[in-house]
A protein has these predicted regions:
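Ribosome-associated RNA-binding proteins
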Residues: 1-177
Length: 177
């Protein structure tokens, strides 16, 4: 019993996809350009008129899973350049009000648990961080960079050495779009 491995991804109007010789896929859309090398032995990515086809030469379990992974990466790249990704986070505190300030490279978190020294969270490559009161909005076109920026912010406010059931201060994810 041989299963059909090929995954077909439709390319929406206004999006251009280029596939290089070294399996580098470049997706350009209204919001910008995302480029990524999607190489795996035995996996082939080819472009038809208005779609991308991800196929494998071998029908083993590892290759089936890599076809799905590659197709998911391509879908995320297409969604990123058309709609973008947005994560909303909320600063939660009980006594000491957290003060947030975003620069181009980092988010400064002051007065966290009453600490005198400000904590900082690194903002990754193509992500933008906007602070509105206690809400932090992370946006961008690369899902992995936006997600890593969100994780950096959450990890910067992790409470260590105290009972996390009591000390629930921090900046937490509340919405993904």
């Amino acid at each position: 019993m041989v299963k059909e491995l090929a995954r077909i991804i439709e390319i929406p109007e206004g999006v251009a996809v280029e596939i290089g010789d070294d399996a580098t896929v470049k997706v350009t859309g209204p919001l910008g350009t995302v480029s990524r090398r999607l190489w795996y032995p035995g996996i082939e990515i080819r472009k038809d008129e208005s779609s991308l086809v991800v196929d494998a030469e071998i029908t083993r379990k590892r290759h089936r899973s890599m076809v799905g992974t590659t197709a998911a990466h391509l879908n995320n790249m297409i969604k990123g350049v058309t709609d973008g990704f947005e994560y909303r986070m909320k600063a939660v505190y009980s006594h000491f009000p957290i003060q947030l300030k975003a620069t181009k490279e980092e988010l400064l978190i002051s007065n966290f648990l009453g600490e005198r020294k400000a904590r900082s969270a690194r903002i990754m490559g193509g992500s933008q961080v906007e602070v509105k009161g206690d809400t932090v909005i992370v946006t961008g076109i690369d899902k992995e960079l936006v997600g890593q920026t969100m994780a950096n912010i959450e990890q910067a406010t992790k409470v260590r050495g105290f009972d996390v059931r009591v000390f629930q201060d921090g900046i937490y994810l509340v919405d993904k779009r």
